Amino acid sequence: MPHDILLNTLSANAPHWRALPLKDKIQLLDTMVIALQSLNVEGHLEWSAASLRTQLMDPVAQELEGAFEALISVSVIKGQLTRLRSTLLALSSTGAATRPKSLRVHTTSKNEEQIIAEVFPLETADKFGPQGKWTGELWLKPGHEATQASCMVEPAAGDAPAPTRVCVVLGAGNQGFLTLVDALDVLFVQNETVLVKHHPLRGYQDKFMRVVFRPLFDRGFMGAVFDTTVAESSALVSDPRVGHVHMTGGKATHDAIMWGSSQEESADRRRRNEPKLKARMTSELGCVTPWVVVPAVFTEKELLHQASHLAAVLNANSSCNCNAPKCVMMSGTWAQREQYVEAVKSALRELPPTPPYYPGETGRYDRFRQAYPSSSHQIQSNADVVRRVRVKAHGGSDEDGVAANGVDIGPTDLPFLTIDMEIEADGTCDNNYALVNEAFAPVVAFVTVHNAETTTSFMEAASNICNEKMFGTLSCTVILHPTTQREYPMETERLIANLKYGTVCINAWTALCYAVDTCAWGAYPGEDPKNAESGCGFVRNTLMFDHVQKSVVRAPLIDQAQVVHVMKPPLNKKENVVDIVAFILKPGLATFGRVVLPRCCCSRLFCGSLAMVLVISCVTIGVLASGVLKQ
């Protein structure tokens, strides 16, 4: 096997990594932050340009998208590094991980006690910036104490020796930073050595990852491979030196690894309950993500704000995100339903479409059109479509949107597909295809729920439909007007408690919850490995809680963070976004000045948006005040 040497090294070093003193791991994290900074803004823009080419986009024509991708990657990766450092520092100095702001006890519908840890805001800096008004909670499994960092406890004398087996991380194909985040979690939270296998779409990121993770590569705690054949990949995960496989990807890949690639083998192994994979498997798979709009009287400003928010997240990354909203659920008696749907469609028309770059995307899109021939509609974009450059990003077919490297064959975008669906409060409907099939394509269903006449009956029906009739348990958004929360406090809390999703977000896209780096991300616990949907296990668990059930994040109905990705002034200029990237990389007065001062002095650039100046000022002051980000 080609990877024998790597596996031998990682296996031999696994006990050393597990026993490595915390101060040494903290030093490694510090070195990694310095390495992340060493790429400078230019290096991160080069990284994002490679990602854009993978997405069949021209990095020159789409320079703003490239700057935003750099902003997201830098924010997520540095946030995780610094938050892990804070947790390990607390463990080292006090013997306990960073504690939450507070703990409270919730009594479940089964009369069980459940601990809820309030984890955001955790520090002063968390209260500043676009997410300053948000709150984040970790709900633990009922009956468990709020224990943390069990994997970091040194074995007592006489205990079994530390494991010598390796974790293989199978990298995501739709977002570059996900692989790095997964590797960080396995290394520092689960305390295992890691061999990363890059996704065929993302092999370009190997050189960037080797810069950031260099101290771990140098000491034999981490390795990486790409361009492996199917046979080599299968042999890799089946190797006896591999004790854990973690993947971010699709259900079909998960099932092929776990149960076998052929239908016959898979069915036989499931029947005998004999998985093909002998190692432990954790995963973050897909979901038909609900976007539940609880009926209320919204002002025009509130309605248009949330419509713009939804349209932007639908369009992001060609809608190839595991948390892309796929079913917008509304009450049939909501007076503003048609106005809201038309506002979302109108906002979609103003957004430039993204190319169908992901393997099989066009085929999945067509299958949804075929499933709903009379109730599906294509939204034609009014935005200027920049000519795309297709690149040979993977070994797919022409259906996947792959042509010869560098050949400009013009716009090949898929118009956004909307589907009108009707469903009864008990979950019955004429055609449930959109509820049980993840599109991973620019498709969304507007689902009208009938016979749920009141606000409370709609909330109950929506919860039951999401839990019982829809594919996946990864994440869910609920749009809750403040008046609804005031008028129905017990009912809204019951809705949040009853939703069986690993992340429940109030009033915002769940990807923005992923950015709250004290919350965990993963499927709701309890999925059957024989019929996995959204997976098993959590990542981004920087506070190292042992028994996470789900994250709950609450945002205001109107909030700057909800539309930061819409690229409105001043974030519609590459240089403005790049300055923020520079500040996040190296917070200091010089980078602070580049973010704030030129914008304060140039009202034409800001188009009068003093509010944004204040937002950015709060972000930067908060970061400067935070000991977490200081070097």
Where do the language-model regions lie?
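N-terminal Rossmann-like NAD(P)+-binding subdomain of aldehyde/semialdehyde dehydrogenases
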Residues: 1-145, 185, 198-203, 212-217, ...
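Structural signal for hydrophobic packing residues in well-ordered secondary-structure cores
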Residues: 14, 33-36, 40, 44, ...
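C-terminal core of ALDH-fold dehydrogenases
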Residues: 27, 457-565, 626
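Short loop-to-beta-strand entry elements in the cores of soluble alpha/beta enzymes
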Residues: 28-29, 190-201, 225, 277-296, ...
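Long, low-complexity, polar/charged, intrinsically disordered or flexibly structured peripheral segments
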Residues: 112-160, 395-405, 417-433
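Conserved NAD(P)+-binding/catalytic subdomain of aldehyde/semialdehyde dehydrogenases
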Residues: 166, 215-329, 526-532
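PLP-dependent aminotransferase-like
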Residues: 166-168, 178-231, 268
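NAD(P)-dependent aldehyde/semialdehyde dehydrogenase
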Residues: 296-297, 316, 322, 330-474
